[in-house]
Amino acid sequence: MANSRNKNENKVRFDLNKKMKTLNFGKLIIGGPQTIIIAEIADSHNGSVEEAKKLVLAAKEAGADVAKFQIHLPDIEMVAGKVQMWDGDLYEILKRNLFTSEQHKEMMKYCEEIGIEYLCTPFCPTAVDVLEDLGVKAFKTGSGEITNLPHHRKLAKISAKTGKPVIVSTGMCTWEEIADTVKVYEEEGAKENLILTNCTSEYPPNDYSHANLGLIKKLETDFGVIVGQSDHTMDNYTSYAAVALGAKIIEKHFTLSRQQKGPDHFISLEPAMLKDLVDGIRKIEVALADKKSISKEEQTVRDWAFHSVVSINEIKKGEIFSIDNLIPKRPGSGIPAKFLDQLYADELIGKKAARDLPANTILSWEDVAK
């Protein structure tokens, strides 16, 4: 059949020996040692620029790297009156809360003034044009756009031409649908600018098992792109785990109060929770160091906690050392106890004592005859 497709046709395998490229997003580096933390404001400003500025400032003060918005053109995005949300008709909600291009421009300027990157999600190709005209530094798409390949084709063309990163959420879709989207970016020469975020499009997920954090590594290895986590859980545990598993971006909805009216407020982090998220992630990043060495603080413990070779009874000068007259004991200030094991025993066992050794003496190498 013309529409049939081999399950693995679009799958792209990543060479694990190849170093992952980092991407520049304004002053930020995506894919580097520091996780990029996105405060997803979305439409939680309720159509107010002043409220939006309060949100951006609060996100900045909490330590977020990015303030993310959404740009809606409802008449182009959707058919009116067809989608009912828990807060009313979606079309009407979008019309009521949307920002004009001038208002987005004002928010971009404000973000720049206070030192936080501006990011925005377009929901149709026309909105992509608006954002490109505004001079955005990157794009972010929602999970609902994953099968809108013309939308992604346009973003991919822009990305290939400009080098701008495109962050794509992967909630509520199949692996094959993700592969199709990746293929679009590959065909347009923009795959190296693509970031995929693992996501569950539940608000919030009703079980932690739905987070599917194991997909973080699978997305990276199958598609060879930088991977993040768009997290809709009500707390920070999933995000912490995602960072430990290699997520380079964490996105969480953000509000000044969960008590506000609107579709996203109740699942969003409040300022104190966002600060906890940032602080926790920064600590985890440090804890993920992979250089094995003995710290100064560890050495203090090592000195007493490790074991030395100790004489069981009195040993006379010239007497042969054996496992019958030596034993491992703390502290670790003498000959290491490993020299009593067969791996190293030939360097000590069978040698002669260089002096008389009282019982319970911690041996040093000076006590071993040359």
Q: What is each residue range found by the language model?
A:
Residues 5-370:
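Catalytic cores and adjacent flexible loops of soluble metabolic enzymes
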